[in-house]
Amino acid sequence: MTLDNLKHSAILSTLFKMADDNDLLGASEFIKDRLYFATLRSKPKSTANTHYFSTDEEFVYENFYADFGPLNLAMLYRYCCKLNKKLKSFTLTRKRIVHYTSFDQRKRANAAVLIGAYAVIYLKKTPEEAYRALISGSNASYLPFRDASFGNCTYNLTVLDCLQGIRKALQHGFLNFETFDVNEYEHYERVENGDLNWITPGKLLAFSGPHPKSKVENGYPLHAPEAYFPYFRKHNVTTIVRLNKKIYDAKRFTDAGFDHYDLFFVDGSTPSDIITRRFLHICESTSGAVAVHCKAGLGRTGTLIGCYLMKHYRFTSAEAIAWIRICRPGSIIGPQQHYLEEKQASLWAHGDSLRSKQRQYQDRSVPQLISSMDNLSISTSIFKSHSLDRMEENDYAENDLGMTQGDKLRALKGRRQPRSATTGAIRVEDVKVHTRSPSQPLSRMKPPASSQGSISPLKSSKVPASSSSSSSSSSVSASAKRIGRSSSSSTNLKSTRLASSLGNLYEPNTESISSGKPPSPSSFTPHPVRTTYNYHYEVNNNNNQYSTTSSPSKSLGYNLNHSGPSGASANARLSAGEQGHQRNPPAGLSGLSTRHLSRSIPSLQSEYVQY
C-alpha cells in the first residue's frame, strides 16, 4: 500500500469518527468510549467505529389497558445476556456500542430501565448514578409508568423507582442472573401453565386463583387445586393464602397436607389493618414458602406481598411496586398503590422493632422469634375499618352478576398469544447458562391532561438508595387484538395447551428457587387522604388433622363472627392448644440438568445488608 493510500485511509477513518461523534452528542455514556445510550429519530447504520442496536421491537410489553411497562424479569435477563455478548465479542472489541431507542416515550422509558438496570447489576452503579447518566446532556426526562387499571392514572412509577427496586432486590438475594432459569420463568408465567411468579424466591409466590375443575372456559384455561400440588411440593410451598371469595373447597389443599387461610377483602380494594397483620403473621410463622392468590393474583395479592417487603426488607412503597411489577406485570392497582405509600412508615417501624427484638433474643441463644400480633397495630388515620363486623363474601362486590376487575385482568392475560420467537430461547453458545428524602415534596398524583415525565425524580432525592415474573410480548398494540378476538375461535387451541400444560405442572424436574436475605434502609413520603372498604373476612381452613403447633391462628386464638344477610353468625374459635402431626418439608432440589449458565454473565456478588 502506497503512502498516499495510507494517508487517504487515515483521513477517511478520521472523518467517520467525527461523524460518529456528532451522532453521539447528547448520548448517555455508561462505559467511557465503549457503551452509550441514545434517543434517535431514525435508524442509524453501524460504522467501522460504532455498533448500533435497538431492542424496541424485540422486547415488547404485553399491556392490559393503558399500562406499558416496566418489562418483565425474563426480558431484563435476555437484554443483559445480549449486551454482555456484544461487550465480549471479538469483532466489536474496538467499537463503541450504542443502544439506541426511538422518541416513542413508552419504548424509550422501557429501554432506559433495561440499560439502567444493566448498569446497576453489572457495572455496580447506584440507581442514582445510572439515572444521572440517563438524563445527562440533552436527554429529556422519562415518561413514568402507570398501573394496569382501566381508569385514569393516579400514581406515577418512575424509571428511578424501578432501578432502586432492582438494587434492593439484588441486596437481599432476590435477583441472581447466575442461577435464574429464564425458560422456567417464561413457562410458568403463562396462563395455561399455572400463571405463577416468585416475588421473593423460596418465600412468597403469587399466582392466579384456582378453580373447582381444570378446564377451558370461554377460551381461558382454569386449573384445579390439584394441578398445583406437584409444583408446590417441589418448591417447599407449605401454605396457601386466599384473598378472594371461595370458589374451590379449601379442604382440597388441607387434605393434601397444605395449610390454607382465607383473608378475604373486596376485589380492587385495600386490606384492613387486621387483614394485613394476620397476613404478615402467617408469613412470619411459616417455615416454608407461602403461595398467595386472589382472582387474578395481581391486585390484592401484590398489595399484601408489598407490605411484607416493606416490613421485612425495608423496601420503599415505590421500590416494592416496581419490583413486584417486574416479577409479575400488572400487579398493584389503583388505590392499592397509595395504600402502600401510606403504610410505609408504620411497616418500617414494626419491622425495625421486630429485628431489634430478634437480635436481643439471638444474643440469648433463642433460635427464632415470632412477633406477638396482639400488641401490634399498623397506625393510620386514613385506612381504618369503620366496623369490626364481618360480612359473608356473597353479601357484596364479588358476585356472579358481573365481571370484577380480577375477572377482566384474567381474561386479558388468558387471550395472549404464545411468546414471540424474537425473544425465544437463547442458543447454547449464547447462554451458559427511593429513597425519597423525607423532605421531598414529590407527589405521585398525575394531574389531568398534563405531560408525564416532566420532572426528574433524581433531583428531589438527596439520600443515596440501595436498590428477579410475565412473558415477552409480540406487539405494543397486542391488547386491542386480544380484546377483539372471539373466545370460541381459540377454545380448541387453549384446550390443547391446557392438556399439555397440566402435564408440565406435574413435571418432576422443576428447579427450586433459593431464598433471600435480610433488609436495608430507605425513606418515605405519605400520600393524600382517600377512602377505603371495610369488607374483610378471614378463616383458618386447617383442621386438627393437618395443623401444626406453629400455626398463627392457633397462637392467637382468634374469635371471629361472620354475619350473613339473615343476621346469622358463624363463630370460628381457634384454640392455641390444638395439636397436629408435624409435616417434614421436602428436601431441597438440584438445578435442572438442561439449564446452562451464561459465560456472558459475570459473577454476581449479592451485597446482603445485615442489620
Curated annotation (Swiss-Prot):
Span of domain Tyrosine-protein phosphatase: 194-352
Disruption phenotype: Morpholino knockdown of the protein causes a shortening of the hair cell kinocilia in a larvae at 3 dpf. There are no other gross morphological defects in the inner ear.
Positions of the UniProt region annotated as B: 193-359
Biased composition (Polar residues): 491-511, 554-569, 591-611
Region (Linker): 179-192
Keywords: Cell cycle, Cell division, Cell projection, Cytoplasm, Cytoskeleton, Hydrolase, Nucleus, Phosphoprotein, Protein phosphatase
Compositionally biased intervals (Low complexity): 456-490, 512-553
Main location: nucleus
Keyword Transferase: no
Listed GO biological process terms: cell division; cilium assembly; microtubule cytoskeleton organization; positive regulation of cytokinesis; regulation of exit from mitosis
CDD domains: CDC14_C (cd14499), CDC14_N (cd17657)
Domain remark text: Composed of two structurally equivalent A and B domains that adopt a dual specificity protein phosphatase (DSP) fold.
Family: Belongs to the protein-tyrosine phosphatase family. Non-receptor class CDC14 subfamily.
Name this protein carries in UniProt: Dual specificity protein phosphatase CDC14AB
Originating species: Danio rerio (Zebrafish)
Gene: cdc14ab
